[in-house]
C-alpha cells in the first residue's frame, strides 16, 4: 500500500479537477462473482475505448473493490476511479449506466477528490471484517478466488505507471 501511495500520489494530485467516481452494479451470490467481475472489467474497457474514440481520454486510476453483505451472503464488486475533469467523470458515469441498465443510479457517485481521497483509495480492495468485527473466511475465499489474475488497480490514460508494484492476486 505504501508503495502504491508513494508511486501514484504526486501524479494523481497533480491532475487538474480530480474527481472521485464510484460505479456499481447489483450485488450477486458468490457463485456469480467471477462472472460479474469479468463483465464489469469488460464494460469498463469498452467505456474507456468508446470515450477515447470520441476524443475523451480518461486520465486517472481505476480500483476494483469487493464487499460482502453477511446478512444476505451476497457480494458487491464495484469500481472507484480517480479521474481528471468533472466532464470526463460525468461521461464515464453516463456510459457506464447505458451498459448497466440494472444498476441503481443512486448507487453511482461523482465527487470532488480531496487530499484524503488518494490515501483512502489505496487502503484495501475488500473489507476484511464484518460489522461484528469477525472475519468470514468463506467470504474472503470467495472474493480472493474471484480476483485471481485481476488487477485491483489500473492506471487510465497517460497516467505514469509505478515501477516494481504488482497488485494482482496470484494462485
Residue ranges and their predicted role:
Residues 1-75, 85-171:
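Right-hand nucleic-acid polymerase module
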Amino acid at each position: 500500500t505504501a508503495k502504491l501511495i508513494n508511486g501514484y500520489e504526486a501524479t494523481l494530485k497533480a491532475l487538474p479537477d480530480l474527481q472521485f467516481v464510484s460505479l456499481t452494479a447489483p450485488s450477486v451470490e458468490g457463485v456469480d462473482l467471477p462472472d460479474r467481475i469479468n463483465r464489469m472489467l469488460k464494460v469498463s474497457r469498452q467505456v474507456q475505448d468508446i470515450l477515447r474514440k470520441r476524443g475523451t481520454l480518461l486520465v486517472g486510476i481505476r480500483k476494483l473493490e469487493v464487499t460482502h453483505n453477511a446478512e444476505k451472503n451476497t457480494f458487491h464488486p464495484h469500481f472507484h476511479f480517480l479521474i481528471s475533469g468533472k466532464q470526463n467523470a460525468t461521461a464515464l458515469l453516463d456510459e457506464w449506466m447505458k451498459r448497466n441498465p440494472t444498476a441503481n443510479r443512486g448507487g453511482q457517485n461523482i465527487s470532488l477528490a480531496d487530499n484524503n481521497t488518494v490515501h483512502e483509495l489505496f487502503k484495501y480492495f475488500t473489507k476484511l471484517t464484518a460489522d461484528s468485527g469477525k472475519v468470514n473466511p468463506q467470504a474472503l475465499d470467495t472474493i480472493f478466488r474471484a480476483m485471481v489474475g485481476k488487477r485491483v488497480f489500473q492506471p487510465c490514460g497517460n497516467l505514469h505507471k509505478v515501477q516494481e508494484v504488482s497488485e494482482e492476486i496470484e494462485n
